[in-house]
């Protein structure tokens, strides 16, 4: 039977439940179990697609086109699996389904209520994933215990403990802060969060204490006394040098052994050698490479978390230390001299939408192109690379994307045909995996080592086919195209040290154990240029 591990959080949000969930799943996977993870989000949005990145962080796109919570990215990166959009359950989805069912007469005249109809819908969605054949399903319940919107999900989890014959474990994650004045750990907030959990009928089996530094045995004893959780089932996730070390420190404390004992499952000895080597490579590297990330949401780093992690994955395999420089494209518009002051080794032009900060991104693209600095553009970053090239190389000074200037005389970027008749925002973009053909002999071909790939997408606009010929005749290489429609998927320059931009999002396929080749190539080029060598991809000198 499938085991279910529910992860709850106390005291405040953003305490690290997502990493704890991914770590627990990884600990079980390291013992030979097949494991998947689910994120429950109690908000009423159907998905994360239309939410402000400053409120929600990155929208993580799944292979099947789901616009999901960024925690699904952590799950995929830790487990090296592909999750579907069904692995992100929101209140909006649940209530929409229940109300639709009531309208269609599914409930045969019953009075439709939170219990049992909403809770049954929640349980059905969790069990549908379990039926795929997993040994264990780890479910992170978003938000904080005590939030009104979380109550139906906690109630559904409580019911599942009754119904699943001992195959359910509850793990509670909560912080124990340190007062600066006394340098003392304070456990009272955690104690109260467990009291809130008990009020809804849930006694946690395991507690993970989040702290800035390792807790003392006295703290563990005090938490045990007031939460009714034995000391050997209390673990500490303290701040470490990389999130990929968290499963290692929790397993060293015995979490894997105790969890499998509670679930009464037979497992193998954990295999951590490859993971440990990569983590050590990540934290012990000394050669530094500076990568500038240029976009408009840089004040909240979580808005681009998959790109940051993809850089770290590639750096770990190359045994270098990435230094990430954040570049606010709006600030570049005010002061273009910021670009040379950064003295960077490589640029990534970040994805995004809208007019704000666009000219700053275009300035950064031009600076990288004219100064032979390695550049990778992603999604909007590719579209604006085309705009910059059309303006500066083709001489089409009014060239733009119709997303920003619908009246431009040279719409080198225009809305895709399939998007023109759509008048809703949510879930209507070109989303998820698409099959792509790579141009034989291109730089991209050498990087991938393949002529046919699949990558994830999230966009409405495309390179305007009316400008294909002009752009190509001016030296812009279309190195990848969609298989099913005439759509540019990647561009590159052969007279530049390293200049590649993609319509797709390579960051969503990067893993610590399997970094994405585009990020590895960017860092290789940046390192070679830093050492004064010819480009390993074009032969161009620095």
Swiss-Prot record:
Record text on subunit structure and interactions: Homotetramer.
NCBIfam families: PRK05380.1 (NF003792), PyrG (TIGR00337)
Source organism of this protein record: Caldivirga maquilingensis (strain ATCC 700844 / DSM 13496 / JCM 10307 / IC-167)
EC number(s) recorded for this UniProt protein: 6.3.4.2
Sequence segments annotated as region (Amidoligase domain): 1-265
ATP-binding recorded as keyword: yes
InterPro entries reported for this sequence: Class_I_gatase-like, CTP_synthase, CTP_synthase_N, GATASE, GATase1_CTP_Synthase, P-loop_NTPase
Source lineage: Archaea, Thermoproteota, Thermoprotei, Thermoproteales, Thermoproteaceae
List of residues binding ATP: 14-19, 71
GN (gene name): pyrG
Protein name per Swiss-Prot or TrEMBL: CTP synthase
Annotated Mg(2+) binding sites: 71, 140
Residues reported in the UniProt entry to bind UTP: 13, 186-191, 222
Residues engaged in binding L-glutamine: 54, 352, 380-383, 403, 460
Catalytic residue list: 379, 505, 507
UniProt keyword list: ATP-binding, Glutamine amidotransferase, Ligase, Magnesium, Metal-binding, Nucleotide-binding, Pyrimidine biosynthesis
Keyword hit for Ligase: yes
């Amino acid at each position: 039977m499938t085991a279910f591990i529910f992860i709850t959080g106390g005291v405040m949000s953003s305490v690290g439940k997502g990493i704890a969930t991914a770590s627990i799943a990884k600990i079980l996977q390291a013992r030979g179990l097949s494991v998947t993870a689910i994120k429950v989000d109690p908000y009423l949005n159907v998905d994360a697609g239309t939410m402000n990145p400053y409120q929600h962080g990155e929208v993580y796109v799944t292979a099947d086109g789901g616009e999901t919570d960024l925690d699904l990215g952590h799950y995929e990166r830790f487990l090296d699996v592909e999750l579907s959009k069904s692995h992100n359950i929101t209140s909006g989805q649940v209530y929409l389904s229940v109300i639709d069912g009531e309208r269609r007469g599914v409930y045969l005249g019953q009075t439709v209520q939170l219990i049992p109809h909403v809770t049954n819908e929640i349980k059905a969605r969790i069990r549908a994933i379990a039926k795929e054949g997993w040994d264990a399903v780890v479910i992170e319940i978003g938000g904080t215990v005590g939030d009104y919107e979380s109550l139906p999900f906690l109630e559904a989890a409580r019911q599942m403990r009754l119904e699943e014959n001992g195959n359910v474990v509850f793990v509670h994650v909560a912080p124990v802060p340190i007062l600066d004045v006394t340098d003392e750990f304070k456990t009272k907030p955690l104690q109260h969060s467990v009291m809130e959990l008990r009020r809804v009928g849930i006694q946690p089996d395991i507690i993970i204490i989040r702290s800035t530094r390792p807790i003392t045995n006295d703290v563990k004893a005090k938490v045990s006394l007031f939460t009714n959780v034995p000391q050997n089932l209390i673990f500490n996730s303290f701040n470490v040098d990389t999130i990929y070390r968290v499963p290692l420190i929790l397993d060293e404390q015995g979490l894997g052994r105790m969890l499998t004992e509670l679930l009464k499952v037979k497992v193998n000895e954990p295999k951590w050698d490859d993971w440990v080597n990569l983590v050590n490579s990540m934290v012990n590297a000394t050669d530094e490479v500076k990568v500038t990330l240029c976009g408009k949401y840089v004040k909240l780093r979580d808005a681009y978390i998959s790109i940051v992690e993809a850089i770290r994955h590639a750096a770990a395999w190359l045994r270098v230390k990435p230094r990430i420089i954040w570049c606010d494209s709006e600030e570049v518009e005010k002061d273009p001299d910021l670009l040379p002051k950064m003295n960077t080794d490589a640029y990534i032009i970040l994805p995004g939408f809208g007019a704000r900060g666009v000219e700053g991104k275009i300035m950064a693209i031009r600076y990288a192109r004219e100064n032979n600095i390695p550049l990778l553009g992603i999604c909007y970053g590719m579209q604006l690379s085309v705009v910059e090239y059309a303006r500066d190389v083709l001489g089409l000074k009014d060239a733009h994307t119709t997303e920003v200037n619908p009246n431009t005389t040279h719409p080198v970027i225009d809305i895709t045909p399939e998007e023109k008749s759509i008048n809703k925002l949510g879930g209507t973009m070109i989303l998820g995996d698409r099959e792509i053909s790579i141009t034989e002999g291109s730089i991209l071909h050498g990087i991938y080592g393949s002529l046919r790939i699949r990558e994830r997408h999230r966009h409405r606009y495309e390179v305007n086919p009316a400008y294909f010929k002009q752009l190509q005749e001016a030296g812009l290489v279309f190195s990848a195209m969609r298989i099913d429609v005439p759509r540019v998927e990647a561009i590159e320059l052969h007279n530049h040290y390293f200049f590649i931009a993609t319509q797709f999002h390579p960051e969503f396929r990067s893993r610590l154990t399997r970094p994405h080749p585009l990020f590895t190539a960017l860092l290789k080029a940046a390192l070679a240029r830093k050492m004064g060598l010819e480009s390993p991809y074009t032969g161009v000198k620095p």
